């Protein structure tokens, strides 16, 4: 019995270090290869020993797929390929291929050059890892080998994010990565067709959340920022380099222009330029409004937002600073936070999810005394606000995607256990499908029913349409035709088309039975008597008298002939195909009983 096996190596009942091992019809695929931002030791990387205890990873894995450039989805990639050892193909979209190495190098600098961490990948390892990448286009079916194929779908979330369908024969799995079912100011909504996979693996970060109106959230955000700078305070907004950062920059830029505000807004050095470059390069990945206006006005060339210098953090007076990274776990955002945390006039606005173990998660949980590096204590007096501008699907969006894809089963990853359990029950109740939520290292095995996909010729469908026999939606219907197999693909076509394609002449197998009838009339008159008798007897059948004197009932042919030895006897030749054997037998019996007497 074919089966699908799924083992989360990371993001199983957890958010961070996304890494899921999928085995489908003998093919092994690793989905994402992320790091956990809450750890600074070996726990930051997935446990790759689950993949295989012996032998090379390249021999076991058929391919690796990366859904997008966030480090909790790609951060362990150089460690995995260059330090653990993997030489096979790594698939990702073109924007992810361009942006991923930049973020990996930025994080490496923080971890190694500034913190002095050991057992970490080098700059050269990042370059060598990226040489193994195969970039894919949206909706492009990529043949990994003779049996395994993958296809990317638009996921929203960040520039270049994609959901992937993995298919082997008739078995398929869809992995969402992170996605957003709601369009925002610079990206469109996630979309997938009704692909009906055996299994849908979906993120569940906001498994129990249904977001309020986006307009209300934006108004609340602008109000809090404005009130803080009005009283002379500073606002820190920790963000990741690309994605939510651009969303909030567009929002503040528009507000500053409308209100004619002079308070400076800063963005981490270099990131504005990088964002401009990549959004221009991959403009087709943005939403329709950005694409339409890009030629006349680049939405990412900001008038009020300037590059940030670290010395600006000590400047007196109000300011707004977008700084990376988004969870306050390292880098410039953490440095600024430490400087501003002691002033109650200031505010930090956390616009996205923070994983456990990060400073962002600690302050959102209510901690106001933090132990920093070197066992130094930091008292947080500044205001802390959480305002979800997350580019993840909420509970409503997850349910919408499940309904759109129509999977046979669902598996939840990238979420917190209690919230996932609530969503799991909701999915099972509403869609009547099995839903799983394995922990890291736990394997879920799903038996699949083998099926053979069959293409149906347009001619056969048109014939059904002409006859008015098209089925109602979701109601099964039998189609009769000839099944042709070519290059391991099956097609159902009409018998005429099959003969033509195969270069065969049409042959027909008919059965003929002789019925002796006492009748002195000529053969034509006997045939006419047969026609009249059958016409009056068989009200529900098509009975015809042909010009050559023969009679037909559906596909059954009846001909009258003289008896070779007895002039007073006629021979009725009744012939039929095997499809009409029952009707042929009935007519033979009927005629053997004789014809009614003709009026004299």
UniProtKB/Swiss-Prot annotation:
Cofactor section: Zn(2+)
Record motif Nuclear localization signal, residues: 469-479
Gene Ontology BP terms: RNA polymerase II transcription initiation surveillance; snRNA 3'-end processing; snRNA processing
Annotated residues for binding of Zn(2+) 1: 68, 70, 157, 178
Location of cross-link Glycyl lysine isopeptide (Lys-Gly) (interchain with G-Cter in SUMO): 381, 462, 475
Post-translational modification: Sumoylated; sumoylation regulates its subcellular location and is required for integrator complex integrity.
Keywords: Cytoplasm, Hydrolase, Isopeptide bond, Metal-binding, Nucleus, Ubl conjugation, Zinc
EC number: 3.1.27.-
Alphabetized InterPro entries for the sequence: Beta_Casp, INTS11-like_MBL-fold, IntS11_C, MBL, Metallo-B-lactamas, RibonucZ/Hydroxyglut_hydro, RMMBL
Main location: nucleus
Motif stretch (HXHXDH motif): 68-73
Residues reported to bind Zn(2+) 2: 72-73, 178, 414
GO CC list: cytoplasm; cytosol; INTAC complex; integrator complex; nucleoplasm; nucleus
Regulation of its activity: The RNA endonuclease activity is inhibited by BRAT1 that forms hyrogen bond and hydrophobic interactions with the active site.
Any one Gene Ontology molecular-function term assigned to this protein's record: RNA endonuclease activity
Entry-linked Gene3D superfamilies: 3.40.50.10890, Ribonuclease Z/Hydroxyacylglutathione hydrolase-like
Family: Belongs to the metallo-beta-lactamase superfamily. RNA-metabolizing metallo-beta-lactamase-like family. INTS11 subfamily.
Subunit architecture: Component of the Integrator complex, composed of core subunits INTS1, INTS2, INTS3, INTS4, INTS5, INTS6, INTS7, INTS8, INTS9/RC74, INTS10, INTS11/CPSF3L, INTS12, INTS13, INTS14 and INTS15. The core complex associates with protein phosphatase 2A subunits PPP2CA and PPP2R1A, to form the Integrator-PP2A (INTAC) complex. INTS11 is part of the RNA endonuclease subcomplex, composed of INTS4, INTS9, INTS11 and inositol hexakisphosphate (InsP6). Interacts with WDR73; interaction is required for the assembly of the RNA endonuclease subcomplex in the cytoplasm.
Purpose of the protein: RNA endonuclease component of the integrator complex, a multiprotein complex that terminates RNA polymerase II (Pol II) transcription in the promoter-proximal region of genes.
Name of this protein: Integrator complex subunit 11
Organism: Mus musculus (Mouse)
